[in-house]
Amino acid sequence: ISEEIMVGAAAGAAMTGLRPIVDLSYSTFLYMAMDQFINQVAKSRYMFGGQASLPVVFRSAMFYGLSTAAHHSDRPYPMFMNVPGLKIMVPASPTDAKGLLRTAIDMDDPVLSFEACLLWGMKEDIEDGEFRIPFGVARTVRQGTDVTIVAISSAVPQAVLAAQILETEGISAEIIDPRTLVPLDSL
């Protein structure tokens, strides 16, 4: 398996009019394709003066907290957040995963989706049919007046538990889930 070739081939396919969705498995393996991500995927629109778009979605899973060792436990999204040209999504629920993925597929920019495997077993009712969740629009998970907790991905359920504990101590906690890190909702 060569992540560098997978990313490069997807970039080429996107430049020719396709909208590939690439599953790169573990997010740790994204490092193997850094040259393609940084120098090709992220910069193509800029290098061609806006005449080329790169409508491609790269999915990767974050397996932290499951004793998967060093090679399967990274969360590299902070590095990618600092690369101009990339959009970053971190869904925390099945509804967000579906709505954000539909939006990502429609975008003309490259999107990296970081999915926490701890959430894969989560169940909830999801709206039938097509719907989209716009990038850069946070979700208020819980209203509160005393403190705000900002959490992403699998930290959102943990934040809900923390807010419930705080509530027993008379502290009202608001929980915000940004859903996308690039663009980040300015609230």
What are these regions (language model features)?
Residues 164, 168-187:
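Generic long, charged, amphipathic alpha-helical segments
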Residues 2-5, 11-150, 154-158, 173:
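Conserved thiamine diphosphate
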